[in-house]
Amino acid sequence: HEIMKVLVATDKPFAKVAVDGIRKEIEAAGYELVLLEKYGEKAKLLEAVKDANAIIIRSDIIDAEVLDAAKELKIVVRAGAGYDNVDLEAATAHNVCVMNTPGQNSNAVAELAFGLMVMAVRNMYNGTSGTELMGKKLGIHAYGNVGRNVARIAKGFGMEIYAFDAFCPKEVIEKDGVKAVGSAEELYSTCDVVSLHIPATAETKNSINYALVNKMPKGGLLVNTARKEVINEAELIQLMEERTDLKYMTDIMPAANETFAAKFAGRYFSTPKKMGAQTAEANINAGIAAAKQIV
């Protein structure tokens, strides 16, 4: 049995402390760690995967081409919750096991969602008079690990908290002191602020559309720290043109970022890169959890 080779392939690197933690786990198990950071072009990834037995990734794309090149590969671990960047069918065809690390980044994402909320209600920090979150109705769209952390923080802000989750029993939501609603439509028509936490799936892609967001009350604020694919961008642009009271804040730059930025100055903001999970703590948690999946 050859020594197991573990490749950490991160175009957007982990914090150094996280890499040190991963290295410690991998080397303690007697495996070899290979680090490929900020590789920029796919050719470098294709070269690096050739002799890897396991790969730890972040938002890196693992498609059929990568899997074809990775002849010795057994395991792919996504450090994070969403694994829409991995071609699962191709992985199955190559007998490669795909794992994720749910829950490790949740608090980091939830805190950022509140940073975006405060920024929006305080008029992008431009010094003019804004509004407060206290007493406002917050809708949490999908009550998973991140959604639960958002609810916890919202209690401290004194918000009235609602949630909709098609897969989470009402009792689970309500025992947290959160009001469970029966549909996405009800959530959007009830809440002043909606925080999106749905994964990108065939069912959810483009589901956040004109008809749904238009149900929001006057001054509605949509915060997206989930995935850009869930937003129907053309319809959201049309709606925000018609309704100048709506705001959209996200940490995933839309494909139509330039259009949003040009048309909706003062009520739209996007971070340059997906950054909800970009904290040293979340990096360490997710990176070490990923390493533990392998060893």
How would you name each of these model-derived features?
Residues 50, 64-67, 168-262:
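Rossmann-like adenosine-cofactor binding region
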Residues 156-174:
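NAD(P)-binding Rossmann-fold cofactor-contacting core
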Residues 10-11, 57-59, 80, 196-198, ...:
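Glycine-rich, N-terminal phosphate-binding loop of Rossmann-like dinucleotide-binding domains
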Residues 34, 53-130, 232, 256:
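Phosphate/diphosphate ligand-binding glycine-rich loop within oxidoreductases
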Residues 5, 10, 17-20, 28, ...:
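C-terminal helix-to-coil terminal segments
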Residues 120-156:
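Glycine-rich NAD(P)-binding loop of Rossmann-like domains
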Residues 3, 73, 134-137, 210, ...:
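Phosphate-coordination loops involved in phosphoryl transfer and adenosine-cofactor binding
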Residues 2-52, 160:
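N-terminal glycine-/charge-rich "phosphate-binding" loop or analogous flexible N-terminal tail
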